[in-house]
Protein backbone atom coordinates (compact mmCIF):
# COMPACT_ATOMS: atom_id res chain seq x y z
CA UNK A 1 0.00 0.00 0.00
CA UNK A 2 1.08 3.59 -0.67
CA UNK A 3 -0.37 6.76 0.83
CA UNK A 4 -0.06 9.84 -1.42
CA UNK A 5 -0.54 13.52 -0.56
CA UNK A 6 0.22 16.59 -2.76
CA UNK A 7 2.46 19.03 -0.89
CA UNK A 8 0.85 22.11 -2.44
CA UNK A 9 3.98 22.97 -4.42
CA UNK A 10 3.68 20.46 -7.25
CA UNK A 11 5.39 17.64 -5.37
CA UNK A 12 4.11 14.58 -3.51
CA UNK A 13 4.47 13.09 -0.07
CA UNK A 14 4.53 9.30 -0.16
CA UNK A 15 3.85 7.07 2.81
CA UNK A 16 5.32 3.58 2.48
CA UNK A 17 5.63 0.50 4.67
CA UNK A 18 8.76 1.86 6.32
CA UNK A 19 9.30 5.54 5.50
CA UNK A 20 8.04 8.99 4.60
CA UNK A 21 9.28 9.97 1.14
CA UNK A 22 9.13 13.26 -0.78
CA UNK A 23 8.87 13.03 -4.58
CA UNK A 24 9.75 15.87 -6.96
CA UNK A 25 8.18 15.02 -10.37
CA UNK A 26 10.12 17.75 -12.20
CA UNK A 27 13.50 16.46 -11.01
CA UNK A 28 12.25 12.87 -10.79
CA UNK A 29 13.91 12.67 -7.41
CA UNK A 30 12.93 10.85 -4.22
CA UNK A 31 14.03 12.02 -0.76
CA UNK A 32 13.51 9.80 2.28
CA UNK A 33 12.87 11.83 5.43
CA UNK A 34 15.11 10.27 8.06
CA UNK A 35 15.37 13.04 10.67
CA UNK A 36 13.31 15.88 12.06
CA UNK A 37 14.61 19.44 11.86
CA UNK A 38 16.18 19.09 15.32
CA UNK A 39 17.90 15.82 14.39
CA UNK A 40 15.42 13.44 16.02
CA UNK A 41 15.19 10.21 13.97
CA UNK A 42 11.92 9.73 12.09
CA UNK A 43 10.71 6.17 12.61
CA UNK A 44 7.44 5.28 10.88
CA UNK A 45 5.91 1.87 10.14
CA UNK A 46 3.27 0.87 7.62
CA UNK A 47 1.92 4.32 6.76
CA UNK A 48 -1.70 4.04 5.64
CA UNK A 49 -2.79 7.67 5.39
CA UNK A 50 -1.37 11.18 4.98
CA UNK A 51 -3.37 14.33 5.69
CA UNK A 52 -2.79 18.08 5.77
CA UNK A 53 -5.01 20.13 8.06
CA UNK A 54 -6.15 23.75 7.80
CA UNK A 55 -3.03 24.82 9.74
CA UNK A 56 -0.82 23.19 7.07
CA UNK A 57 0.38 20.51 9.49
CA UNK A 58 1.22 17.07 8.18
CA UNK A 59 -0.61 14.17 9.83
CA UNK A 60 0.71 10.65 9.38
CA UNK A 61 -1.34 7.60 10.30
CA UNK A 62 -0.42 3.94 10.29
CA UNK A 63 0.46 0.88 12.30
CA UNK A 64 1.74 2.87 15.28
CA UNK A 65 -1.10 5.39 15.40
CA UNK A 66 -0.82 9.04 14.43
CA UNK A 67 1.96 11.61 14.37
CA UNK A 68 1.64 15.33 13.60
CA UNK A 69 4.40 17.47 12.12
CA UNK A 70 4.98 21.09 11.26
CA UNK A 71 6.35 21.04 7.73
CA UNK A 72 8.31 23.51 5.64
CA UNK A 73 9.82 22.26 2.41
CA UNK A 74 11.59 19.00 3.19
CA UNK A 75 11.93 19.83 6.88
CA UNK A 76 9.50 18.42 9.42
CA UNK A 77 9.28 18.83 13.18
CA UNK A 78 6.85 17.03 15.46
CA UNK A 79 4.02 19.24 16.72
CA UNK A 80 3.18 18.67 20.38
CA UNK A 81 -0.60 18.78 20.05
CA UNK A 82 -1.60 15.20 20.86
CA UNK A 83 -2.81 14.51 24.41
CA UNK A 84 -1.13 11.66 26.26
CA UNK A 85 -3.43 8.77 25.39
CA UNK A 86 -3.10 5.20 24.18
CA UNK A 87 -5.94 5.96 21.75
CA UNK A 88 -3.52 7.90 19.53
CA UNK A 89 -1.44 4.71 19.20
CA UNK A 90 -4.20 2.64 17.57
CA UNK A 91 -3.68 1.40 13.99
CA UNK A 92 -4.95 4.35 11.95
CA UNK A 93 -6.83 4.06 8.64
CA UNK A 94 -7.95 7.64 7.99
CA UNK A 95 -7.75 11.22 9.29
CA UNK A 96 -10.34 13.90 8.58
CA UNK A 97 -10.88 17.52 9.62
CA UNK A 98 -14.51 18.61 9.97
CA UNK A 99 -15.66 22.11 9.02
CA UNK A 100 -15.51 23.18 12.69
CA UNK A 101 -11.82 22.24 12.95
CA UNK A 102 -12.30 19.05 14.96
CA UNK A 103 -10.06 16.21 13.79
CA UNK A 104 -11.63 12.75 13.42
CA UNK A 105 -9.53 9.60 13.20
CA UNK A 106 -10.68 6.20 11.94
CA UNK A 107 -8.86 3.17 13.34
CA UNK A 108 -9.15 -0.60 13.52
CA UNK A 109 -10.69 -0.20 16.96
CA UNK A 110 -13.36 2.43 16.40
CA UNK A 111 -13.00 6.13 15.64
CA UNK A 112 -12.39 9.16 17.79
CA UNK A 113 -12.41 12.93 17.78
CA UNK A 114 -9.48 15.07 18.81
CA UNK A 115 -10.52 18.45 20.13
CA UNK A 116 -7.24 20.32 20.05
CA UNK A 117 -8.66 23.41 21.75
CA UNK A 118 -9.83 21.44 24.79
CA UNK A 119 -7.02 18.86 24.59
CA UNK A 120 -9.59 16.10 24.75
CA UNK A 121 -10.12 12.79 22.96
CA UNK A 122 -13.43 11.00 22.74
CA UNK A 123 -13.67 7.49 21.34
CA UNK A 124 -16.63 5.70 19.77
CA UNK A 125 -17.01 2.01 18.96
CA UNK A 126 -19.65 -0.71 18.65
CA UNK A 127 -20.81 -0.16 22.22
CA UNK A 128 -21.89 3.35 21.16
CA UNK A 129 -23.74 2.17 18.03
CA UNK A 130 -20.98 1.93 15.43
CA UNK A 131 -21.72 -1.17 13.29
CA UNK A 132 -18.08 -2.30 13.21
CA UNK A 133 -14.89 -1.05 14.84
CA UNK A 134 -12.85 -0.96 11.61
CA UNK A 135 -13.38 2.54 10.17
CA UNK A 136 -11.92 3.01 6.67
CA UNK A 137 -13.19 6.43 5.63
CA UNK A 138 -14.78 9.59 7.07
CA UNK A 139 -16.66 12.29 5.14
CA UNK A 140 -18.74 15.24 6.36
CA UNK A 141 -22.01 16.26 4.68
CA UNK A 142 -23.57 19.73 4.44
CA UNK A 143 -25.50 19.12 7.68
CA UNK A 144 -22.35 18.46 9.71
CA UNK A 145 -22.98 14.72 9.93
CA UNK A 146 -20.12 12.28 9.45
CA UNK A 147 -20.39 9.29 7.11
CA UNK A 148 -18.16 6.36 7.97
CA UNK A 149 -17.28 3.33 5.85
CA UNK A 150 -16.63 0.17 7.86
CA UNK A 151 -16.44 -3.61 7.60
CA UNK A 152 -20.16 -3.80 8.25
CA UNK A 153 -21.68 -1.13 6.05
CA UNK A 154 -21.82 2.67 6.17
CA UNK A 155 -22.75 4.62 9.27
CA UNK A 156 -24.06 8.17 9.56
CA UNK A 157 -22.93 9.80 12.82
CA UNK A 158 -24.43 12.98 14.23
CA UNK A 159 -21.76 14.67 16.40
CA UNK A 160 -24.39 16.77 18.19
CA UNK A 161 -26.59 13.87 19.32
CA UNK A 162 -23.81 11.25 19.19
CA UNK A 163 -26.26 8.90 17.47
CA UNK A 164 -25.50 6.46 14.63
CA UNK A 165 -27.72 5.54 11.68
CA UNK A 166 -26.37 2.41 10.00
CA UNK A 167 -26.80 1.25 6.39
CA UNK A 168 -26.04 -2.22 5.03
CA UNK A 169 -26.06 -4.19 1.79
CA UNK A 170 -29.83 -4.57 2.13
CA UNK A 171 -30.11 -0.78 1.76
CA UNK A 172 -28.31 -0.91 -1.60
CA UNK A 173 -24.63 -0.80 -0.68
CA UNK A 174 -22.15 -2.57 -2.99
CA UNK A 175 -21.24 -4.79 -0.02
CA UNK A 176 -20.97 -4.45 3.74
CA UNK A 177 -17.16 -4.37 3.43
CA UNK A 178 -15.27 -1.27 2.32
CA UNK A 179 -11.61 -0.43 1.63
CA UNK A 180 -8.91 1.82 3.05
CA UNK A 181 -8.29 5.15 1.26
CA UNK A 182 -11.36 4.65 -0.95
CA UNK A 183 -13.63 7.59 -0.28
CA UNK A 184 -14.26 11.13 -1.53
CA UNK A 185 -16.85 13.91 -1.57
CA UNK A 186 -17.32 16.11 -4.62
CA UNK A 187 -17.84 19.88 -4.50
CA UNK A 188 -21.51 19.19 -5.26
CA UNK A 189 -21.82 16.98 -2.17
CA UNK A 190 -21.90 13.58 -3.86
CA UNK A 191 -20.22 10.92 -1.75
CA UNK A 192 -18.25 7.92 -2.97
CA UNK A 193 -17.08 4.94 -0.93
CA UNK A 194 -15.13 2.08 -2.51
CA UNK A 195 -15.59 -1.51 -1.39
CA UNK A 196 -14.86 -5.09 -2.36
CA UNK A 197 -17.65 -5.22 -4.96
CA UNK A 198 -17.44 -1.73 -6.44
CA UNK A 199 -18.42 1.79 -5.42
CA UNK A 200 -21.35 3.07 -3.36
CA UNK A 201 -22.37 6.64 -4.19
CA UNK A 202 -25.14 8.86 -2.86
CA UNK A 203 -26.27 12.38 -1.98
CA UNK A 204 -26.85 12.50 1.81
CA UNK A 205 -29.55 15.16 1.60
CA UNK A 206 -31.64 12.92 -0.66
CA UNK A 207 -31.68 9.96 1.73
CA UNK A 208 -34.91 9.50 3.66
CA UNK A 209 -35.42 7.51 6.85
CA UNK A 210 -38.14 4.90 6.68
Each model region followed by its residue ranges:
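Carboxylate-rich, polar loop motifs that coordinate divalent cations or form catalytic acidic clusters
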Residues: 1-210
Amino acid sequence: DLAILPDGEGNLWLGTLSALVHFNPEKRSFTTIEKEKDGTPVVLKQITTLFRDSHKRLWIGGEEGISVYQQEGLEIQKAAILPASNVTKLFTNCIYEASNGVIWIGTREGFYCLNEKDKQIKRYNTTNGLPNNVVYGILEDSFGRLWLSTNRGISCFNPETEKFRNFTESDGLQSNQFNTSSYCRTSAGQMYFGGINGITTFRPELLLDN
